[in-house]
């Protein structure tokens, strides 16, 4: 069939097994072809084709509510709800979002991008349904990786206690992004291999029900016998102990098994968990064979052999550079312990993991635990390196503030994907960390201008013993500068002048330095002499340099690829005010008070007026203001 002509999932209700299998194959072919051009989360989506089809066949969306945890596995859902024709624009500027989006479709009931949120949201929707005396199903779909998140476990506890009518689909593919870790993963592993459990339990219950009632003693014995079977077959029936009816595990690629089990689940009163076993990447061999997470989310690739299409780059990947520098120093410093919340592949930590298995901890999708574990290590004079994406550090804010910074512990926080990240969009843009870290006492924040300075900042962070220190580094690759062989620690709070200039100053750091230098070149052609400062320490700032610039009455333009509210530019304004420079002429360029959508980073910067041309225009206004207030020197 022509997938582009689908307008509603209702067509699935009349299809037989053979027809369903044909549609499933067409969807897989479609996804493989489209994602080979745009990139995307191909592995997770190939694994949920049959499951998604059967959910839409057995339930009535949008009346019945589907909540896709994380949301990266919702491509099939988008195809079935009439958006196949938009897949050429997947994750592109102004195109189809890679995650559920309420403005896209009435079928996207829950927006997400971060993990472990679906169960809590589902509890809220179910509670609203019950309060309003409505009758519909609420169906969160959560992966075994996301289920390790503390928020998901909190929600399971509440849902089971409240006996809320809800059908939880556990999509178990044994991976989140990288292979899963933890005790819960082991529990699920036992359930996967205990497929005879459900059958045996049903047979035993049937047998017990046929026994005549001869008194409480026999009934009690029978109940103990049932309980004994549970614990003999599966050590710790986790979900049933939490108050859920457990159904499964079942083959998530078997239409008949899915139909039978979902039909049963619809009849259950109270919460039910359907445990579905799926194969991540099913139907495309390179993705099926992936055991470490390379095919979780990809860029473009060649369909015939699965080779990734690499863009031209000059320098090493930032994640690789930082991780490799930590690895080298860790060979000399046994205090260094690396922690990651389920991102060993994304943050390029495999080398550290291989060299130091006893000093490497992948804690799963557990950012709060990761941060406080780092604090615990620091109390014992270890040097924890917490490698975490900027967007996921948001989830550990209280732990950073309360457990790390308040006791002033020496924790090195590597903030990966700092700044705009592009195609993953508003849920993943790393633009908030400066604002929520800068106001925390004892915190040091830095960001390098290039990869050479980046490796020196790793050395700085490891040697620093004055409290927590955060090193921000962007997604993508460096600019290709030579790397020094010998690493040195930088003076904390020191800036450097990259370009002398008497008329005005641009203060910036990290990825926006090339833009600032370009703007200075453009202004030089107009006879305007601009100083460009690498404000590499966002906190503490270089007070001596700020005093020099402000006392000379030089207009200042700050540029940051981060939110303006509470950001670096705000810090410069605060400094000017607090030190009596009440006539300071300061303007700020950065991320406005809005969420930034998906798209190419250059397109996004142009959209929010953060280009060299915009910097030139703003600087011209500043210089005019200087003339108007009569501060010419």
UniProtKB/Swiss-Prot annotation:
Q: Where, in this chain's numbering, is thiamine diphosphate bound?
A: 72, 113-115, 145-146, 173, 284, 367
- Provide the cofactor note recorded for this chain's UniProt entry: Binds 1 Mg(2+) ion per subunit. Binds 1 thiamine pyrophosphate per subunit.
Q: In which pathway does it act?
A: Metabolic intermediate biosynthesis; 1-deoxy-D-xylulose 5-phosphate biosynthesis; 1-deoxy-D-xylulose 5-phosphate from D-glyceraldehyde 3-phosphate and pyruvate: step 1/1
For molecular function, the Gene Ontology terms on record are: 1-deoxy-D-xylulose-5-phosphate synthase activity; magnesium ion binding; thiamine pyrophosphate binding
Q: Name one Pfam family in it.
A: Transketolase_C
Q: Which PROSITE patterns does the record cross-reference, listed alphabetically?
A: TRANSKETOLASE_1 (PS00801), TRANSKETOLASE_2 (PS00802)
Which cofactors?
Mg(2+); thiamine diphosphate
Q: Which reaction does it catalyse?
A: D-glyceraldehyde 3-phosphate + pyruvate + H(+) = 1-deoxy-D-xylulose 5-phosphate + CO2
Q: What class of enzyme is it?
A: transferase
UniProt binding sites for Mg(2+): 144, 173
Q: Name one GO cellular component term.
A: cytosol
Would you say which domain of life the source belongs to? Bacteria
State the EC number(s): 2.2.1.7
Q: What's an example GO BP annotation here? A: thiamine biosynthetic process
Q: Which terms are listed as keywords in the entry?
A: Isoprene biosynthesis, Magnesium, Metal-binding, Thiamine biosynthesis, Thiamine pyrophosphate, Transferase
The UniProt similarity line reads: Belongs to the transketolase family. DXPS subfamily.
Question: What is the protein's quaternary organization?
Answer: Homodimer.
Q: Please name the PANTHER family in this protein's record.
A: 1-D-DEOXYXYLULOSE 5-PHOSPHATE SYNTHASE-RELATED, 1-DEOXY-D-XYLULOSE-5-PHOSPHATE SYNTHASE, CHLOROPLASTIC
Briefly, what is this protein's role?
A: Catalyzes the acyloin condensation reaction between C atoms 2 and 3 of pyruvate and glyceraldehyde 3-phosphate to yield 1-deoxy-D-xylulose-5-phosphate (DXP).
- NCBIfam families assigned to the protein according to its UniProt record, in alphabetical order: dxs, PRK05444.2-2
The protein here is known as 1-deoxy-D-xylulose-5-phosphate synthase
